[in-house]
Amino acid sequence: MLPIEVGADLRSRHIEGYIQDNTGDNISAKNKMYCELTAQYWAWKNLDADYYGFFHYRRYLNFSENKYPLDSWQNITEERLNDTCLKKYNLNDDCIRNLVETYDIVLSEEKNVAKMPDRNTSVYEQYKNGRSLNIRDLDLVRDIIAVKYPDYLDTFEDVMKGRKTCLCNMYIMKKELFHEYMSWLFNILFEFEKQTDMSKYTVEGYRTPGHLAERLLTVFCW
């Protein structure tokens, strides 16, 4: 695992021992908009690997075969990540390597939005009811896909009408698939940014590209 400090371009003090996302070809200065995607962009442009995967500082995948109780948001929760958790969820190089070498892509389990606290009936409705989110942004992304990637339009609409989606922008992908996904994703998001005035968005609303990417990951992998 390689720790990356995101948004490094926005601060003068950095986390010792971490790679910063503001080296080489990067979008670090846009971290308030693109969230964890600035790390993914950095890895895409600057890191050569056989597989690429992303966790958050407080979110990880479970690599064990065991099922554990879920909270109302369908997540497994722990007070902190410690040695017990590392063992419990098989968070070690050997277990991760054995799994990822078997598949082209590893994702978190799909979450059913109808079982979350807000009880939305579809992925589209969940976004529409999201705090600080604007459904016009998701509609614009649909229009962009219709122009740039029409072969994905039916899939996009199927995902939006459905109840299941993968959230949090976490995954592990084989190199070729990762590069394809990054090119596809940022081609859509950069076009969205070009067409959208977010100057009056709230702090959370300004993170819209990150929120959109969560839904787009499901579309790409569908």
Residue map of PLM features:
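ER/Golgi luminal nucleotide-sugar-dependent glycosyltransferases, focusing on the catalytic module
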Residues: 1-222
